[in-house]
């Protein structure tokens, strides 16, 4: 979508008007300015005083959010932006009173039809003018993509690009000083959206923070379909019930927890962990565990090994890496359930085949090949040449939890390797614009058993200091040229009190416990190559 703007002649008048208005007046008078943009129609323009809840009656029920607590004083603007004759995005722009001269766009999650209101609140609290969208459809299902290529295009890349263009223009109209720098913050699908911006729209953002990025998107979905091929249903000998996954996890941790020098129930570097399962297998004279929950059979051991192994195409190329060890208990509850994953079922029904009757239990390598060949709007997001973004002066910080139970952290390693090989840059050269941090004890995007509070999203925000907050670390890198050597994470107890901190290393460095003293002391750890 092309957006043209016709406001230069009235710019001086607008500047005078802004200077003479209060923040509240400027907000309530902003509707006409929004509506003057091509293909944009305001639906809500309101001043919201901080420290109150805002009701969200139009938010899709599947988004599971009916209100949002707003921390800072903001001008809230909701609007519909037409992206084609058959598609549109719902977008919100929040303009804080405590504006710091920075613009920011946030991403989505899953199939991405939910505005991330917590991120809007989090970033406006930090002084960003922030925008977010529904990614072109409402709710968490992919059903909106059925026979709707323009809606799918919004999901693939156009929604964030449109939000950046419209959001930047509105920011310049709302604040006399405009904005100095532009940023992006997202995780999972939002991480993929960040890299899509880097690859396809290198001038949209000065700094991109992309957590647990779902790049290799098509192959990630096929891997999700492949899981059922491996586990089978609950009646098959290949299936493991949750209790057996607990045994598997305990064995993984027994073998791998101490590889980093500390017995802390965390795996710092899953690349070093190659567990075997002879010690928990049932006696060799039993082909079945007869319902025992104390040992696994040979068939079940093969299931575990396959899930931890890469998924290959028939030509020997890797489609997607296996799941990293250490994530077994949560992954078993969400992915290894003995039924096909909804993620794969919906994508193949509503995108690949446009057939609502497609049976996900029949998934095989031919389906993965069909999906990869289709790759609509290059949603794979696997371009290895990031030179346009680099030449534009952009910076990337990506992070991935080593306990991620949905998107294997090995995927971020593989993408880093792909960029390294494509651009022919050594890690120290990549460090000039692209840094990857492995976060031990972080699950998918946030939470987990370790020092996972790094400020990559609203749920993981604890401190605003650049050393403790990945978003503010990006600001310091872009605006002061100070690149982060580490990202400090904080472990909180159940009452929200800090237990310990840990400095998470930039890849390819790994964390090793050197002592002396407790592993709870961040200075007892060292980043080594």
UniProtKB/Swiss-Prot annotation:
Q: Where does Ca(2+) bind?
A: 257, 260, 262, 264, 266
Q: What biological-process GO terms show up in the record?
A: xylan catabolic process
The answer to whether keyword Calcium applies is: yes
Q: What InterPro entries does the record point to?
A: AB_hydrolase_fold, Tannase/feruloyl_esterase
Q: Give disulfide pairs as residue numbers.
A: 27-75, 63-114, 187-445, 256-273, 282-295, 505-527
Task: Give the GO cellular component terms, alphabetically.
Answer: extracellular region
Catalysed reaction(s)? feruloyl-polysaccharide + H2O = ferulate + polysaccharide
Q: Superkingdom of the source?
A: Eukaryota
A Pfam family annotated for this UniProt entry: Tannase
Where is this protein found? Secreted
Entry annotation: catalytic residues: 188 (acyl-ester intermediate), 404 (charge relay system), 444 (charge relay system)
* Predominant cellular place of this UniProt entry's protein: secreted
Keywords, alphabetical:
Calcium, Carbohydrate metabolism, Disulfide bond, Glycoprotein, Hydrolase, Metal-binding, Polysaccharide degradation, Secreted, Serine esterase, Signal, Xylan degradation
Q: Where is the signal peptide?
A: 1-19
Q: Name one GO molecular function term.
A: feruloyl esterase activity
Q: Which residues are glycosylated?
A: 53, 64, 85, 98, 138, 233, 286, 290, 354
Q: What is its EC number?
A: 3.1.1.73
Q: What class of enzyme is it?
A: hydrolase
State the protein's purpose: Involved in degradation of plant cell walls. Hydrolyzes the feruloyl-arabinose ester bond in arabinoxylans as well as the feruloyl-galactose and feruloyl-arabinose ester bonds in pectin.
- What family is reported? Belongs to the tannase family.
Entry protein name: Probable feruloyl esterase B-1
